[in-house]
Design a protein with these regions (language model features):
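Conserved beta-strand hairpin/beta-sheet module of binuclear metal-dependent hydrolase folds
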Residues: 11-64, 138-150
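Conserved S/T- and glycine-rich ATP-binding loop of Class I adenylate-forming
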Residues: 37, 72, 129
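Active-site environment of divalent metal-dependent phosphoester hydrolases
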Residues: 30, 53-55, 74-80, 99-102, ...
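Hydrophobic residues in well-ordered beta-strands that form the structural core
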Residues: 48, 93-96, 148-149, 190
Length: 213
């Protein structure tokens, strides 16, 4: 994988404290964020959204001690590297509601709402966030401000709900009831683009409802 290793940025580190490091790469034509959450006490890690460019992701996994893959939802731009990850031996988890979207690429385990996923000494708690897809899910790293929201919440509003099985009212309720109760300092790490915070987005909910997207 020498040539692939050269394609990795000089640093993939995105956020760090004494317990956890978050690494980020941007892949594919839709510029998807792929995150690796790593426990600094044990070296264990999990990858969020095996989107694309599987060779690069496999190199990243080898470097960082990734043990499994978590999918925030089943849209094609978020699952393009899933077959290669599974072939390499990584378990891929997705919610049961979005599992049919992975019928062609496969999956290994269901992620339930409020499930605690242990990554070394870290605990990631799943938060079911329907709206963008029926089974979209976010992940909060307990004891940290980190909240991975997939395509549910972005800087400036909710994810796209123009798909056949998406629903704007549902995503608004999902964000308001399940994400906005987090503290204002919570860092939102979305599936595309830059980070934001709950405090930056929460005051604009009524604007989003009024505009309808």
């Amino acid at each position: 994988m020498g040539a692939i290793a050269e394609q990795l940025p000089s640093t993939t580190l995105h956020w760090v404290n004494s317990d956890v490091a978050v690494h980020r790469v941007v892949v594919g034509p839709w510029e998807n964020n792929v995150f690796v959450v790593r426990c600094l006490r044990t070296g264990d890690a999990v990858l969020i959204d095996a989107a694309n460019e599987h060779e690069l992701l496999l190199e990243l996994c080898q470097r960082l001690g990734v043990r499994r893959v978590l999918e925030t939802h089943g849209h094609p731009d978020h699952i393009g590297a899933v077959p290669a990850m599974r072939e390499a031996g990584f378990e891929v988890g997705v919610t049961s509601a979005d599992a049919p979207k992975l019928a062609q690429v496969g999956y290994d385990a269901f992620i339930d709402d409020a499930e605690v996923i242990e990554v070394g000494r870290l605990r990631l708690r799943s938060i079911l966030n329907p709206g963008h897809t029926p089974g979209s899910v976010s992940f909060h790293v307990e004891g940290t401000p980190l909240l991975f929201t997939g395509d549910t919440l972005f800087p400036g509003g909710p994810g796209n709900t123009s798909f056949a099985d998406a629903d704007f009212d549902t995503i608004i309720t999902s964000i308001d009831d399940r994400l906005f109760p987090f503290p204002a300092t919570t860092i939102v790490l979305p599936g595309h683009g830059v980070d934001t915070t709950i405090g930056a987005e929460r005051p604009h909910l009524a604007e989003w409802v009024a505009r309808g997207w």
